[in-house]
């Protein structure tokens, strides 16, 4: 990206102020590890590339843009402002004039104290967050987006730090679930330029359920998530007992029906999703220090006490 051999000496002097020797040699395959000055350089080189041009050529009137980024590190903190400014300066009028929303995820976990070889120190998360917010709240920047969503939970959950993207195992977290919900909120709302949204749970409890997650989120998630959870609990039982269940006989829910690739496909089958992905996801949400436990995961058989809390959700 930086062809230093062709630069004048005064340009090299300037670069030495911005980038250390470690920056020059740091691999970027997993992001910029808390170095937004590196991220902005790399991401800017992608503007005008094949992927960006494909997006630009297919974007049409009425389409919307939603940018998801973290704010305490390098990749997201650098990429969000860069993308936003490029969209608003695009020569595609549909992109330039579109509704643009963004989710900025602030710290919601800490890492164990870093060692000498660690590239990331979570003690710097809040400092970097405050630095980014100073820029994000400037009027010339707020005029670029229509709706901004902020979410954080800085005082919960410490993860052991591993300087390896494969071995660094972070559990699914309620912040990620609520952050994803902001996409749906943005899709159905026409906010005026510079609108800011912040999330507040109904009660500051270590374990959150449908009673304490907040009324609008409860209404949005309660019915559908409960239906999905019931399906995950009942599907295998129904399949195993299909020959003895009258509704299976009446509706031809037989061996041929349950052998359909819709259920059994090794990559996209429903059973793979329910047994391997959904069950581990809902379990990880429950295990965090700030846990989301809408259901009694230990319950077997009768489901009249399946839903934690008072058991009511809005249909």
What are these regions (language model features)?
Residues 69-79:
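Gly/Ser/Thr-rich loops at beta-strand to alpha-helix junctions
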């Amino acid at each position: 990206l930086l062809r230093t051999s062709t630069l004048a000496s005064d340009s090299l002097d300037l670069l030495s102020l911005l980038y250390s020797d470690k920056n020059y040699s740091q691999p970027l395959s997993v992001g910029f590890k808390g170095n937004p000055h590196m991220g902005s350089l790399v991401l800017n080189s992608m503007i005008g590339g094949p992927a960006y041009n494909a997006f630009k050529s297919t974007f049409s009137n009425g389409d919307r843009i939603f940018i998801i980024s973290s704010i305490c590190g390098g990749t997201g903190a650098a990429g969000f402002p860069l993308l936003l400014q490029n969209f608003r300066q695009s020569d595609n009028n549909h992109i330039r004039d579109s509704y643009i929303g963004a989710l900025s995820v602030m710290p919601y976990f800490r890492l164990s104290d870093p060692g000498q070889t660690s590239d990331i120190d979570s003690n710097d998360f809040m400092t970097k967050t405050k630095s980014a917010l100073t820029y994000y709240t400037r009027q010339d920047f707020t005029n670029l987006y229509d709706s901004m969503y902020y979410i954080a939970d800085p005082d919960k959950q410490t993860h052991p730090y591993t300087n390896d993207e494969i071995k660094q195992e972070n559990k699914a977290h309620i912040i990620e679930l609520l952050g994803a919900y902001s996409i749906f909120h943005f899709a159905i709302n026409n906010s005026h330029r510079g609108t800011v949204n912040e999330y507040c749970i109904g009660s500051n409890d270590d374990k959150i359920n449908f009673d304490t997650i907040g009324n609008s989120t409860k209404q949005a998630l309660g019915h559908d998530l409960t239906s999905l959870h019931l399906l995950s609990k009942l599907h295998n039982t129904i399949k195993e007992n299909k020959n003895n269940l009258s509704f299976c006989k009446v509706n031809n829910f037989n061996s041929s029906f349950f052998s359909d690739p819709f259920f059994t496909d090794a990559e996209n089958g429903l059973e793979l999703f329910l047994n391997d992905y959904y069950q581990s996801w809902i379990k990880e949400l429950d295990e965090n220090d700030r846990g989301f436990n809408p259901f009694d995961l230990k319950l077997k058989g009768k489901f009249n006490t399946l839903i934690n809390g008072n058991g009511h959700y809005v249909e």
